[in-house]
Curated annotation (Swiss-Prot):
One Gene Ontology term, aspect cellular component: membrane
Protein name as catalogued: Transmembrane protein 19
Keyword Cytoplasm set for record: no
UniProt-annotated location(s): Membrane
UniProt keyword list: Membrane, Transmembrane, Transmembrane helix
Family, similarity comment: Belongs to the TMEM19 family.
Disulfide bond positions: none
Keyword Transmembrane helix included in the entry's annotation: yes
Listed transmembrane segments: 15-35, 49-69, 84-104, 218-238, 257-277, 313-333
Membrane-topology descriptor: Multi-pass membrane protein
Primary site of residence: membrane
Amino acid sequence: MTDLNDNICKRYIKMITNIVILSLIICISLAFWIISMTASTYYGNLRPISPWRWLFSVVVPVLIVSNGLKKKSLDHSGALGGLVVGFILTIANFSFFTSLLMFFLSSSKLTKWKGEVKKRLDSEYKEGGQRNWVQVFCNGAVPTELALLYMIENGPGEIPVDFSKQYSASWMCLSLLAALACSAGDTWASEVGPVLSKSSPRLITTWEKVPVGTNGGVTVVGLVSSLLGGTFVGIAYFLTQLIFVNDLDISAPQWPIIAFGGLAGLLGSIVDSYLGATMQYTGLDESTGMVVNSPTNKARHIAGKPILDNNAVNLFSSVLIALLLPTAAWGFWPRG
């Protein structure tokens, strides 16, 4: 009887806690909306953000991050960073949000997939991924900055990607998509390639065979996975455009977004591999037979110099792809 009462008490406390948290979130959303309305009235040229958008931008990232903590996809510092990134991208543009969401969900699933196999291959493998704030920053800093610039340029809301009518805003949209697709492509390649590939990876700089897990090692399976990862993010962006953008009939076609995402995923993975092969140390610990990312007395050098770590490589790859691809896309993008 005591155990039953304890369970009822715990459920009651949990229910009350959820109600209190939801009430606080609603209050925060309303406070942001009031600030938005005040700023719009004072400055005159600012478009107020609806209370529903504020509410969605606060509630949904909280729910996603809470689920990520529960499933060990994030640690506590990663959850805090994820809240900031999620809020800014969601309030800026729902297409940004869905792209980020698909990247996070797919990456988390693939990180856990075949975990026992990856444990034997990766000396730094963590159960569930457990991404910390550094990893969140290196994957989310570029999209977050672009989302802020987008809001300054265009204000919150969804727009068609159309260089002939809104060059700067369209460039930033594609740049943000490129950064997320690059991160997705690299993650899909590193999580799927080592498990499914039947052949040994080859170092991207010399094309020599290297052990599984070597930074800069590529396989056909990994490259195809990176293409699919970027395409997956591109599809999420494209579908959100179809739902939320009103004037698509008088704008440039949006379907190239899907191809752009796939290209960003593939090229991002290639750039990441090249940086990893040249600026990231890889050695083989002969006592364990596992690949390591830092020099030790027992490690035999395979490739790279200890200049960058994996997080820095991811950040540099994201920056390069985000800067270069939208400019290249401008020359080929259909005109409305």
